[in-house]
Amino acid sequence: MKKVLRNVQMLNEQGELQTVNIAMADGKITAIGQEVTVVNAEVIEGNGLIVAPGFVDVHTHLREPGFEHKETIATGSASAAKGGFTTICAMPNTKPVPDSVENMQLINGLIKESAVIRVLPYGSLTKDISGEVRTNVEELKAYGAVAFSDDGVGIQLASTMYEQMKDAAKHDMVVVAHCEDNSLIYDGVMHEGKRNKELDLPGIPSICESVQIARDVLLAEAAGARYHVCHVSTKESVRAVRDAKAAGIRVTAEVCPHHLLLEEMDIPSDDANWKMNPPLRGADDKDSLHAALLDGTIDCIATDHAPHTVEEKCCGMVGAPFGIVGFETAFPLLYTQFVETGKWTLKQLIDWMSVKAAEIFDLPYGTLAVGASADMILIDIQKEQTIDAEGFVSKGRNTPFNGWVAKGWPVLTIFEGNIVYQEAE
């Protein structure tokens, strides 16, 4: 079916808005311009709203298979679509883990059956995410692994990481790491700083993260591997990534919205909806993350969408699982706090959430161009509303942003030329 998205505002390379029409057919963009018309096409009225590429999230947790009480591929992908995402990469901490061809085929089948957008599964670096027996990179790549990670835990043995990096390098695959030295966690539930002492809660020191990044960038250099750092949260980690890039090591990094928006002193009480890993750090860490994003040390923004049940998150931090949801609030929160205030341009934010993320894994998504996949969203930058976790499409309600007021909401999401989310009238 031919379609035309009519009367929308699209950013050009200079960051200027131009009124265009966008034609689509067979899941691809066929024309972009002010005078685009297509005979016998379905017309989607853009009403002068901003059009952007569908967002790309390289770090998400969909929980299926194995933990469907927290989230499913259906609910998670629908939540992502509502937030403006059309491509998401699903981490392998499921049950079973995508550590074999059989398990990868199972997950691919579930995705094909339930996903409303593009879901690209990770393969695990080690069997059962144990950090011990390495997986077969070549086999898992052949069955659709977008990259390789044991996210949720850090790989403790340098030899395991090094050997798997060498194997990944042979097959031009990216190794993606949750960096955490288990010997430095100390059963912590939040950042080791001022606030954990005030709340009398065990803390996780910054060095727990940064020491493993420092190790891994040197391993990546020796292995000739491409290496991506998940959810950078400390100034020391930023320094390690910046130094590695300066040395020519093939490293990329992401930052999460919550680490840009919040710091440890914002935590109001012993509330598990404020518990995530890595934890909210100090104000100086947050400032360092901002600077790193602006200077290119950090490449993109990723949500680390991590849903849990209300029962799991209803009490204090000790004993509760780490993680918060992020799909449905990421763009409006960042737009309100940084674009509206003039700290970022709209183009910067959109790029960090789309094309810059796609480039990490050489994905051909996150752009609006003739021949590209017809993945796009409409954003109403004037729309303001209060975040209400009870209204989330995700099964997860675990967010520290409940009750925040934000502007700039995605109101329509198109994936491969089909509307997969539209705001109710």
Curated annotation (Swiss-Prot):
EC number: 3.5.2.3
Cofactor binding mode and count: Binds 2 Zn(2+) ions per subunit.
Keywords on record: Hydrolase, Metal-binding, Pyrimidine biosynthesis, Zinc
UniProt cofactor(s): Zn(2+)
Biological process according to GO: 'de novo' UMP biosynthetic process; purine nucleobase catabolic process
Enzyme type, top EC level: hydrolase
Binding positions (Zn(2+) 1): 59, 61, 151, 304
Physiological role: Catalyzes the reversible cyclization of carbamoyl aspartate to dihydroorotate.
Protein name from the UniProt record: Dihydroorotase
Annotated organism of origin: Lysinibacillus sphaericus (strain C3-41)
Top-level taxonomy: Bacteria, Bacillati, Bacillota, Bacilli, Bacillales
